[in-house]
């Protein structure tokens, strides 16, 4: 039978985002260089107004078979390079490739709660396939920028707060700016020791949904 179309290559893009952006979620634009479908020939690789013909060597299957002993060896047709078609008049813009290098600006929807290594897939935004075949996908890998106040452990946010000896001995209250824009008040018990952890429920990172 006829060989199925060869997809374009998948692409990877590494993106650094702030902890604030990971907390709130936000659409961000990226610009990438990618092999995109040629607009002149609409990806066919043939000069507009001309036709492609079925490869006469493989009969349009894109594959060649040869008997080697007890085995049948299948390989890509050397005449049409697996496409099953031969272009007699190549497109002058893309030189018969069906794709050209372009710079594209894409919008990436970043959901709240993403973390280091979170992968976002943009279907069909990878390289265009050869001769008008389907494109690959674009995978965005997220990396968290270092934050001036918080360290992150999963959905937990950690910060270190210096307090006076008097506050440690007598107790008091501490205000910490949250990523939600609010100032969170934390009660410090009297006699607290250095290194003691205090927890503020609900003030950490949101849970990433649907992943």
Task: Report each predicted region and the residues it spans.
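Charged, often glycine-enriched C-terminal and inter-domain segments
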Residues: 3-27, 70, 85-93, 97-211
């Amino acid at each position: 039978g006829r060989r199925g179309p060869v997809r374009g290559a998948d692409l990877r893009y590494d993106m650094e985002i702030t902890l604030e952006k990971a907390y709130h979620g936000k659409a961000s634009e990226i610009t990438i260089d990618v092999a995109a479908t040629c607009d002149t020939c609409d990806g066919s690789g043939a000069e507009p107004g001309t036709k492609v013909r079925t490869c006469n060597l493989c009969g349009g299957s894109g594959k060649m078979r040869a008997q080697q002993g007890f085995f049948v060896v299948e390989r890509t047709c050397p005449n049409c390079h697996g496409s099953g078609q031969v272009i007699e008049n190549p497109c002058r813009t893309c030189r018969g490739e069906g794709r050209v290098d372009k710079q594209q600006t894409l919008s990436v929807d970043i959901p709240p709660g993403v973390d280091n290594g979170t992968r976002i897939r943009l279907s069909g935004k990878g390289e265009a396939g050869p001769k008008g075949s389907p494109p690959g996908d674009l995978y965005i890998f997220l990396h968290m920028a270092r934050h001036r106040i918080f360290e992150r452990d999963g959905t937990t946010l950690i910060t270190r707060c210096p307090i006076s000896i008097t506050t440690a001995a007598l107790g008091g209250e501490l205000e910490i700016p949250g990523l939600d824009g609010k100032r969170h008040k934390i009660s410090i018990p009297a006699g607290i020791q250095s290194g003691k952890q205090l927890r503020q429920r609900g003030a950490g990172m949101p849970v990433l949904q649907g992943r």
